[in-house]
């Protein structure tokens, strides 16, 4: 994780400042320790051997001078102490040396306890500095951990947003490919099954649908229903045309058969009239010879007639067998035609059902697509508005932070001015004090008060650290709960996506099955057309055979008359059968129309149910989106709270740094105060030396005067 430049500069400056403080504290402690050790050594050597103290002290001063060049006040103190000890050793008489240890002990009692008391104070200050540095490090570590966690949360949010953005175009591409494939299949089906007029009517709405994707779903549904109705009308018109053509052919055949029957009837009447005329032209009475001759002729003529009758009966039998075969072939052809008609009818029904289900699936897909587009647009708008709100809130927070910083800086300036005034007052009070002992006692009291303040500050800092730890634990708990909730939500979304994918796969399988059924129906239609072609050929052959039979019937009157009567009966039966078939077809068509109407009503009801289901699904999706938006707002609020807490912790860290700086300034002031006290001590020691010199002079004058006093009475005497 990359740190910001401002944080890096602050950390570098704090580290440098801590190093400089450590070095200065170590130097001052080392100097004071060396000074105290040297003073102790000089006191012990004076007690043991005053004659050798001068040389040892000169050597020690030579070594200490190189070690303590930087502290001028300490060197001056050392020099004054050594001068005082040397003068006392040189000038004090032997009888005064017995009493002298008491006085220096008093001086030492007045001066040395302050130095001994300074050592624990300095040690406590160094410990306090180390404690503050450890606390600052702990605060820095906590801040860095919080920053890392916040950055991890931000990165996770960005990753999730990128995944959502990448999933949306993939889903839209899949839907577009599915719709394009379904549209192409529908166009190809319409091109193969319908006329050019229906093709144009089908192409126009698709082209308009491709060009005008932004229109509502109602207009597209109306156009599709119109196309379906036109297609059904065309199919029924084609069926009616076929039936009418068949009826016309049958009527023509009936007219031809009626004409042949009338011709045969006229011929029979003519022959009967001829037979009656021949019978009437015969003579009544004849002779025996003539009667015998006529009888012979009649027998011969009867034999001829019998032969012709037998021949005609044979031909009639042959023709009847041929007619039976022709009738059987016609019956088979009719059966084939009926089976083909039923197959075509079944295929048409299957295609109609397949087309209807296909249109229904396409309508559902388009409705889902429109709903998804609306949802995506609404979500994008909500995201844009939320981003704008976040930007505005960030700007407001930045302005408030800048204002708070300015207020804090102004407060710090006022506090620094007050501190400067108080320090000036303290310096005035300390200057007014004359006695070094009282001044040192005040210093001790001041140090004790500082220690109390330090302990209070430490307690406050520990309390604040405990607070920060508690807040950190709460933040971690909230973060864990948020992670668990986010994982649950993601799992629910993944399950919903898998359900939708399964539904899409099922719809695709259903469409493929319907396409396979349509292909099978096409194959069956081709087979039926082939069978119809064969039936037409057979009908043509039968017609040729009928023509040949009619030519043979024209030569034979009686047989044709009988056959004509039989044919009339058969034709009447056929006409009755055709009428019954026509009635049946009309009833079947009426039933088909009624069934189709009922089917359409059922489809309308199913469409209404599907629309209600889609509305329910849309309401559910909207409620889920609202819930997700609420959760998003809740998470945004949490993030803002965490950012505010982070800012507060940063401000606390800055305040700790400022407190640290104030403590450093206090330490500097204490150093300055110690230097001032050392200078005052130097001045006091100088005054003490002057007083000792004056005392010595006075003692010498008193001794001289005492020496002069005994001589004065002798001279008087």
Swiss-Prot record:
Its main location: cytoplasm. GO terms for biological process: cell projection organization; centrosome cycle; establishment of cell polarity; microtubule organizing center organization; neuron migration; regulation of cilium assembly; tube formation. Residues 129-168, 221-278, 352-590, 622-712 form a coiled coil. The keyword Coiled coil applies. The modification Phosphoserine is found at residues 4, 28. The keyword Transferase does not apply. Pfam families: CCCAP. It is found in: Cytoplasm, Cytoskeleton, Microtubule organizing center, Centrosome, Centriole; Cytoplasm, Cytoskeleton, Microtubule organizing center, Centrosome; Cytoplasm, Cytoskeleton, Cilium basal body; Cell junction. One of its GO terms (cellular component) is centriolar satellite. Disruption phenotype: In renal epithelial cells gene knockdown results in the formation of spheroids with architectural defects characterized by disturbed localization of beta-catenin (CTNNB1) at the basolateral membrane, fewer tight junctions and an irregular lumen. SDCCAG8-deficient mice display developmental bone malformations with rib cage abnormalities. Residues 216-717 are annotated as: Sufficient for homodimerization. Keywords: Cell junction, Cell projection, Cilium biogenesis/degradation, Coiled coil, Cytoplasm, Cytoskeleton, Phosphoprotein. Residues 84-115 are annotated as: Disordered. Expressed in liver, kidney, spleen, brain, heart and muscle. Expressed in photoreceptor cells of the retina. Plays a role in the establishment of cell polarity and epithelial lumen formation. Also plays an essential role in ciliogenesis and subsequent Hedgehog signaling pathway that requires the presence of intact primary cilia for pathway activation. Mechanistically, interacts with and mediates RABEP2 centrosomal localization which is critical for ciliogenesis. Homodimer. Interacts with OFD1; the interaction is direct. Interacts with FAM161A. Interacts with RABEP2, ERC1 and CEP131. This is Serologically defined colon cancer antigen 8 homolog. It comes from Mus musculus.
